[in-house]
Amino acid sequence: MVLLAAAVCTKAGKAIVSRQFVEMTRTRIEGLLAAFPKLMNTGKQHTFVETESVRYVYQPMEKLYMVLITTKNSNILEDLETLRLFSRVIPEYCRALEENEISEHCFDLIFAFDEIVALGYRENVNLAQIRTFTEMDSHEEKVFRAVRETQEREAKAEMRRKAKELQQARRDAERQGKKAPGFGGFGSSAVSGGSTAAMITETIIETDKPKVAPAPARPSGPSKALKLGAKGKEVDNFVDKLKSEGETIMSSSMGKRTSEASKMHAPPINMESVHMKIEEKITLTCGRDGGLQNMELHGMIMLRISDDKYGRIRLHVENEDKKGVQLQTHPNVDKKLFTAESLIGLKNPEKSFPVNSDVGVLKWRLQTTEESFIPLTINCWPSESGNGCDVNIEYELQEDNLELNDVVITIPLPSGVGAPVIGEIDGEYRHDSRRNTLEWCLPVIDAKNKSGSLEFSIAGQPNDFFPVQVSFVSKKNYCNIQVTKVTQVDGNSPVRFSTETTFLVDKYEIL
């Protein structure tokens, strides 16, 4: 099969996006596409037409056509299979099959087309692999960003907690008719109330702003910042200033959850000479009225050996999954040994695993539409009121053995209507006025904290608050597949090993 070009065009033959896989001029491809509508015979059910030099294989998509231009001696069955893959790629990047939407995402489509065909020949890829390749996803980068964002949120939360304590102390002192104490009296390291307020204000505000360069140190002389020991109103002004900057004063329940999240972040894993990475990624789509449209989970065990004396080993796998996952071992792994004894070892026991490289020894896949398999259910209830919409969002953890960390539930908002008015909330929130989104942030969701809700009001229509997107990380995998023991092939002696488990979100949407 030689594929000359792939294009999306209108019914009149106007090219919207076209990718040529062989050397071809713009005039040539435009001429081929312009001639295409004239060759079609509406009275026939064929999805291909031929000329003296090329063959058009096409599929209608509402008002557009997905067209493949191939040589006449290509395999028509392979052409049709490739055409179906091209047609499935387009809805992945375009919400509507319209000319404006295709033009807006033309580069994304071209990158995806290049993953399907190389130099005119079809690559052996599926839709999930195309999505992964075009996203250029990095697990390490996601983990690094998640840890950094959590540290920033914890620092902001601590500053807000201190500000609230200062405000409460001031009010208590005013009730008793006393003047609130300042922050002096600690010897040579004494700090005035004014400089402390300046430090707190600067820390909280700077956290949300991109850091261009390190801020210069403030002089220890007189400061024009707020002085907490002066007037009672200045403390209230300080808190109001936080609110005007878009910050939210944290409640006591939020402080409790933040402390729990800080306990979760353990120091980096001490990697042994035999190290395993167990990674799972979930793709899930639910309907706003309930029902699981699709859930797909991919998992893999990656083995890394840093000492060649441990090259000839076997992994003892404990599979407690009851959801019906499909397991697949590496081609060099003894499949009979794994099926009979749940041991991962090479077919030739005299050979060693590669050293200083990550080797995928076992992978699994789960695809279902069973609602009971959803790890975290999200219910979004927008109801129209006189001034706009009252939105109530609830979450519930269905898998009690999971512990989800750094959970962010992102709700789209109408543009140009201002910030939402928050009612009750479990956790904390961020309003991104540039992207018109409301982010509901929850440090930890586990069996002790398995449900919560958020209520807010804003102008808009119910459809404005979808799709809702969810992201999280977890150090417990979903399918309950673990490596419990590692032994050497000779003598069956145990080997020390370390394990790193990660459960990530690839795509989690409520449409």
Curated annotation (Swiss-Prot):
Annotated GO biological process: endoplasmic reticulum to Golgi vesicle-mediated transport; Golgi localization; protein transport; retrograde vesicle-mediated transport, Golgi to endoplasmic reticulum
All residue ranges annotated as the MHD domain in the record: 271-511
Pfam families: Adap_comp_sub, Clat_adaptor_s
Modified residues (Phosphoserine): S223, S244, S493
Alphabetized PROSITE patterns for the sequence: MHD
Sorted UniProt keywords: Acetylation, Cytoplasm, Cytoplasmic vesicle, ER-Golgi transport, Golgi apparatus, Membrane, Phosphoprotein, Protein transport, Transport
Function: The coatomer is a cytosolic protein complex that binds to dilysine motifs and reversibly associates with Golgi non-clathrin-coated vesicles, which further mediate biosynthetic protein transport from the ER, via the Golgi up to the trans Golgi network. Coatomer complex is required for budding from Golgi membranes, and is essential for the retrograde Golgi-to-ER transport of dilysine-tagged proteins.
Protein name: Coatomer subunit delta
Gene3D superfamilies: 3.30.450.60, Mu homology domain, subdomain B (2.60.40.1170)
Gene behind the chain: ARCN1
Signal peptide region: none
GO (cellular component) term, any one: Golgi membrane
Main location: cytoplasm
